[in-house]
C-alpha cells in the first residue's frame, strides 16, 4: 500500500505514483513533477 501526498516515507518506493519521498526532513511524499 503506497503513501499519499504528505504521507511519511523512507524512499520513493513508499510513495504512490507521481510522488517522491522528500530527501530532507520532513520525509514526506511530494509530487515528483510527472503526469504520466
From Swiss-Prot:
A GO cellular component term found in this entry reads:
extracellular region
Coiled coil feature spans: none
Record-given protein name = Mu/omega-theraphotoxin-Pmu1a
What job does the chain carry out? Gating-modifier toxin that targets both voltage-gated sodium and calcium channels, with described activities on human Nav1.7/SCN9A (IC(50)=5.5-7 nM), hNav1.6/SCN10A (IC(50)=9.9 nM), hNav1.4/SCN4A (IC(50)=62.9 nM), hCav3.2/CACNA1H (IC(50)=955.4 nM or 63.5% inhibition at 10 uM), hCav3.1/CACNA1G (95.1% inhibition at 10 uM), hCav3.3/CACNA1I (90.8% inhibition at 10 uM). Acts on Cav3 currents mainly by inducing a strong depolarizing shift in the current-voltage curve.
Q: Does the keyword Disulfide bond apply?
A: yes
Tell me the InterPro entries matching this sequence: Huwentoxin-1
Write out the annotated subcellular location: Secreted
Q: List the disulfide bonds.
A: 2-16, 9-21, 15-29
Q: In which tissues is it expressed?
A: Expressed by the venom gland.
The family annotation for this protein states: Belongs to the neurotoxin 10 (Hwtx-1) family.
Amino acid at each position: 500500500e503506497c503513501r499519499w501526498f504528505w504521507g511519511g516515507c523512507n524512499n520513493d518506493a513508499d510513495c504512490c505514483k507521481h510522488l517522491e519521498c522528500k530527501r530532507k526532513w520532513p520525509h514526506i511524499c511530494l509530487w515528483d513533477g510527472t503526469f504520466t
